[in-house]
UniProtKB/Swiss-Prot annotation:
Residues 1-19 form the signal peptide. It catalyses: N-acetyl-alpha-neuraminate = N-acetyl-beta-neuraminate. Belongs to the NanM family. NCBIfam families: muta_rot_YjhT, PRK14131.1. This is N-acetylneuraminate epimerase. It comes from Shigella boydii serotype 4 (strain Sb227). It is an enzyme of class 5 (isomerase). One of its GO terms (molecular function) is racemase and epimerase activity, acting on carbohydrates and derivatives. One of its GO terms (cellular component) is periplasmic space. Its EC number is 5.1.3.24. Homodimer.
Length: 368
């Protein structure tokens, strides 16, 4: 169905029969990753385990095709990008050989021509989970994400506690009851050159690192929207990275999803309009934190946003709504629109459908 809403006011929705954007994913899909290359969509990991699938969006009979399984084990929160015809997968959260949950800093490459994976002899200088990845001038850039040592230590402690609920409660209280700066989320910008498989320092945010931000780039500009400032506490901040000229500039734009912000939202561009949609967060957590409660989301219920915002004339306007709140899916550029694949809804339920958000003359169209 189609729902059209002006950028200035939410109008009555008009519904019409329409074909689905894409066929349903082979499995309910959330916390995975995806990329698009020459109109072919690739998705995998997350709730799909080690599975990967592709779909030719230009095919008359659109269907998902299974690819070679990912060799690095099941992972959540990995990122991926296409460079020169190859798919690169960065980090994620999964089990190590001892069965402990950990953050990875490795890189895998998939060759679509041979349907084969290889683990590269390359490791990022820090863990990659909750990070974002984008491509600029033939290189992959990574920023944001949790601190590998702190995160891994948390899960080591939980493993030691086992089924001792008292010990688990104590570990959680200790883990969440700290200020945002004490989690050392990554604020460095790293670049990965696929030709050399080397990582380099590319800059750092003058503010703070986030985890679970939405990312979108066009030309020399990249936007990082919302995300976690610490576990359980989101931010409404929007950062712009400007690669114009020889010097990278970091800018801070007007906030969105205020006051609490969201993580796991979706970002894209349609007809030069910057879009931000969905995401999940804890209403009231920002107020709790500002009043000195570091465990800001304790006792709060996670909520899922239906809001669609457009960046217009230097500010964000709520310009439409999703049919249901959604977060932690894959967002990709397709047909001059924002394509959302999968995600989770209330209660953490993984979904199989896709959503296409388009903008024309400041009007938002949502196709399910």
């Amino acid at each position: 169905m189609n729902k059209t809403i002006t950028a200035l006011a939410i109008m009555m929705a008009s519904f019409a029969a329409n074909a689905s954007v894409l066929p349903e994913t082979p499995v309910p899909f959330k916390s995975g990753t995806g990329a698009i290359d020459n109109d072919t969509v690739y998705i995998g990991l997350g709730s799909a385990g080690t599975a990967w699938y592709k779909l030719d969006t230009q095919a008359k009979d659109k269907k998902w095709t299974a690819l070679a399984a990912f060799p690095g084990g099941p992972r959540d929160q990995a990122t991926s990008a296409f460079i020169d015809g190859n798919l690169y997968v960065f980090g994620g959260i999964g089990k190590n050989r001892e069965g402990l949950t950990q953050v990875f800093n490795d890189v895998h490459k998939y060759n679509p021509k041979t349907n084969s994976w290889v683990k590269l002899m390359s490791h990022a200088p820090m863990g990659m989970a909750g990070h974002v990845t984008f491509v600029h001038n033939g290189k992959a850039y990574v920023t944001g994400g949790v601190n590998q040592n702190i995160f891994n230590g948390y899960f080591e402690d939980l493993n030691e506690a086992g089924k001792d609920s008292t010990a688990v409660d104590k570990i959680n209280a200790y883990y969440f009851d700290k200020k945002a700066e004490d989690y050392f989320f990554n604020k460095f910008l790293l670049s990965f050159d696929p030709s050399t498989q080397q990582w380099s320092y590319a800059g750092e945010s003058p503010w703070y690192g986030t985890a679970g931000a939405a990312v979108v780039n066009k030309g020399d500009k990249t936007w990082l929207i919302n995300g976690e400032a610490k576990p359980g506490l989101r931010t409404d901040a929007v950062f712009e990275l400007d690669f114009t000229g020889n010097n990278l500039k970091w800018n801070k734009l007007a906030p969105v999803s205020s006051p609490d912000g969201v993580a796991g939202g979706f970002a894209g561009i349609s007809n030069d309009s910057l879009i931000f949609a969905g995401g999940a967060g804890f209403k009231g957590s920002r107020e709790n934190y500002q009043h000195g409660k570091n465990y800001a989301h304790e006792g709060l219920k996670k909520s899922y946003s239906t809001d669609i915002h457009l960046w217009h004339n230097g500010k964000w306007d709520k310009s439409g709504e999703l049919s249901q709140g959604r977060a932690y899916g894959v967002s990709l550029p397709w047909n001059n629109s924002l394509l959302i694949i999968g995600g989770e809804t209330a209660g953490g339920k993984a979904v199989t459908d896709s959503v296409l958000i388009s903008v024309k003359d400041n009007k938002v169209t949502v196709q399910n």
